Every structure is written in C-alpha cells, then in structure tokens.
C-alpha cells in the first residue's frame, strides 16, 4: 500500500469472491484518503541540526551528513541515493533528494512563531512515472531542540492538519473473482490473488510485493514487502454502508502504528 509523502498511508480494501456480497465488487471504484479523519502515528521523528551537521536517527536508513546545501550520498533508501540540507535562516530549512542525478523530492520546512509546530511544503516525484504528489506536512513538537542546535531540531509528530494532493490520496481497485487489481494516479499497480502467494507491485521502488489474506467478509489483511522483507501490514475494514474504509496500519520498517480512513468517491 503506497504511503504518501507525509508518511501516512493511503488505504485500499480488497474482497473475496466466495462471499456473495463481495462477489458483486462492493469495493470496486475510486477511493480517497481522509487525513483529517485519520489518526497519525504517535511515535515521533527525531531530527538534529547542529554544528553544521544534519542527522535523523528515526529515518530508514538513519541519516547524518553536512548541512551545507550540497548533495551527499545515501545508501539503502529505494527512493533516493543523494540528499541535501540547507539552512536558510533561524526558522527555515530546505531539503532535497536525488536519484541517479535527478531531483525526486524537495521540501521547505518552517518553524511556527511559537516554536511548537512546523510545516513542510513538499513536492514528491519519487514514483518512476514522475507524477507529483504535493502538499504540506504539519508537525507538532514532542521534545525541544538541544541547546545550541537549530530551532527545527527535536522530536516531531505528524498532525491531521497535513494536506496532500489528490495524486497522493486517491486509489482505484477492481475485483475479478479472487483477483484484486489496484492502481494509483502515480502509476503504482498490482493484480494479486486473495489468499494467494505474494504478487508483484509495479511503479514503486520501495514496495515490490504484496500478499492479501481474507480475515472476514468485509475485512482484508495485507502484507507489503520490499524484496522478501515485510515492511508493513494493513488490516482494512469496510463500514456497514460501504462508504468508508478504516485501516489499522503497522509500519514495520519505521516501528510506527496509525489508523487511516478513506471514503468512496
């Protein structure tokens, strides 16, 4: 399940054809994630910008490089292989990411006047299709910046004030028997057999396989993989009126849990 650029998950739900209601394709169609109705992860991200060095201990892989505005090599991230951080002033920092020499993501992070929240206006082009996801991530401070560090240092937790473009929230799926097809505006897609073996995911370098397991007539359990390594699980349930999907997300890669909501369009 593709995560949009903020780290929150965009939901999908799948159905098993052996159940009469599901055989009618009640999940078929277009859905859209609702950030306001969702519950972001409680576990914060930890950033330190001090003595000319940027570090992120909660990033995967952990990051540490000079905050000099130049690009520095990053090993182990499927979405980018270079990153840069530039300090604009006492309350603003710019970040950028490249892959194979091409800029794939940019963000301008700004501290609020009270120092207790920050906003990150971002453009994400990490999908191989090049389709952009844009928006503004809004974070609340959980722990203060250490003495002598830039004011944007500290521990931060995402809030429901975050805004994301439809390209990062919308998804479509269609059921044919026990096969569920999934697609997004950014070009991510798969066709997976429910209760079958892992299927190939295309269009996302960090999400390469998916496995679906039916747990109840209107609930499906999904496991996502990067290669052969599980990176997340999603327990997706349909509301009684079939207009809302609620997903319990377990981000195994980052050790975070959250609850995501999507509505039928």
Summary of predicted features, one role per range:
Residues 23-265:
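Hydrophobic small-molecule pocket/channel-lining residues, especially in calycin-type beta-barrels
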Residues 1-8:
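Bacterial N-terminal signal peptides that target proteins for export
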Residues 9-17:
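Bacterial N-terminal signal peptides
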């Amino acid at each position: 399940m593709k995560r949009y650029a903020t780290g929150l998950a965009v939901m999908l739900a799948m159905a098993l054809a052996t159940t009469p209601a599901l055989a009618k394709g009640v999940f078929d169609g277009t859905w859209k994630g609702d950030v306001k109705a969702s519950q972001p992860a409680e576990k914060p991200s930890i950033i330190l910008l001090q003595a000319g060095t940027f570090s992120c201990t909660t990033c995967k892989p952990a990051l540490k490089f000079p905050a000099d505005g130049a690009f520095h090599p990053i090993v182990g991230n499927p979405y980018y292989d270079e990153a840069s951080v530039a300090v604009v002033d006492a309350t603003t920092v710019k970040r950028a990411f490249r892959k194979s020499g091409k800029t794939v993501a940019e963000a301008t992070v700004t501290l609020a006047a009270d120092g207790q929240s920050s906003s990150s206006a971002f453009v994400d082009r990490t999908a191989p299709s090049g389709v952009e996801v844009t928006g503004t991530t809004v974070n609340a401070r959980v722990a203060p910046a250490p003495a002598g560090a830039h004011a944007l240092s500290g521990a931060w937790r995402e809030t429901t004030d975050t805004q994301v473009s439809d390209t990062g929230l919308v998804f479509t799926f269609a059921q044919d028997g026990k096969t569920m097809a999934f697609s997004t505006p950014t070009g991510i897609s798969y066709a997976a057999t429910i209760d079958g073996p892992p299927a190939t995911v295309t269009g996302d370098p960090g999400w390469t396989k998916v496995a679906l397991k039916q747990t109840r007539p209107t609930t499906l359990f999904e496991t996502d993989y990067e290669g052969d390594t599980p990176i997340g699980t999603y327990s997706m349930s349909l509301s009684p009126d079939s207009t809302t999907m609620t997903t319990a997300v377990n981000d195994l890669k980052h050790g975070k849990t959250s609850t995501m909501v999507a509505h039928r369009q």
